[in-house]
Amino acid sequence: MNNLKRFTKSIFSCIALSGLLFLGGCETLPPMTDLSPITVDNAAQAKAWELQGKLAIRTPEDKLSANLYWRHSEERDELTLTTMLGTTVLTLEATPNSAHLHIDGKDFRDTNAQALLERVSGWSIPINDLPLWITGQIGSLDRVIAVDSAGQAKQLQNMQTPPPWLVTFLSWQSQSGAKVPYQLTLERGDLQLKLQLNQWQALGKPSILLGEKP
């Protein structure tokens, strides 16, 4: 059994134990202890954020859906996938120099989160670029190939590693004062990821609330 099948089988087993496969309600994760909710003019101003939403992964062999919780800052990322009943099926904690993945009672470590996920799952998921795309931003290696009627990026290709990732922004919303995607898809070969952001909250240091810029 290859890495991808082992990975999805482990997640499906955890979800099956909870008695439910698809997406459902969300529980609120506690905020980062040193950060507070802020309002920003655009997503690029938010050096930290947290989101609650849904993630669906599709391959020719498997379909996986889960609730997604992600807390991001320049110093660390904390990502959790859960079932509707709140059962945690995967956690990923990462800093610029380390990554820890916990799934199905097993722990995996590496110096890079993207490399760790690829080693364990077989998926080359662009964890390093996702914070930009989730907030509707364009990276230095991204090429915009379609725009909407307002001139905003609708589709882009990431040219970092061939074959390129194709990112499509399906819909947008206003959260924390900024315009961010509501739904987007990432496609590369026969792997497709679909994300839905039910809640996105910009975070900043407490001093920001007193008038400093984030």
From Swiss-Prot:
InterPro entries: LolA/LolB/LppX (IPR029046), OM_lipoprot_LolB (IPR004565). It comes from the Bacteria. Residues 1-25 form the signal peptide. CDD domains: LolB (cd16326). GO terms for biological process: lipoprotein localization to outer membrane; protein transport. Gene3D superfamilies: Lipoprotein localisation LolA/LolB/LppX. PROSITE patterns: PROKAR_LIPOPROTEIN. GO terms for cellular component: cell outer membrane. Keywords: Cell outer membrane, Chaperone, Lipoprotein, Membrane, Palmitate, Protein transport, Signal, Transport. The keyword Glycoprotein does not apply. It is a lipid-anchor. Plays a critical role in the incorporation of lipoproteins in the outer membrane after they are released by the LolA protein. This is Outer-membrane lipoprotein LolB. The lineage of its organism: Bacteria, Pseudomonadati, Pseudomonadota, Gammaproteobacteria, Alteromonadales.
